């Protein structure tokens, strides 16, 4: 995937699922090769900067996209994913989330 490592100013954010209130936390992290993104706290799930698609939920080494901001017309900074509505796809299901930047202690 056309991914570029970026150092980001945001340290953490949450994806809050509309249908049931489930919250996923993502923290700034780097993978084994030093690529910087945001890793979900409960598994190897990433939100990363893609050179063409901008911020996506996806894999470093695969072209599959699992989620992205709903409003693609919004200007996106390379340093942190945009707050607002995100949508995801898992198999035949889709979910709507709010991405909220959070402060860390």
What spans do the regions from the language model cover?
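Interface elements of modular peptide-recognition networks comprising either
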Residues: 1-105
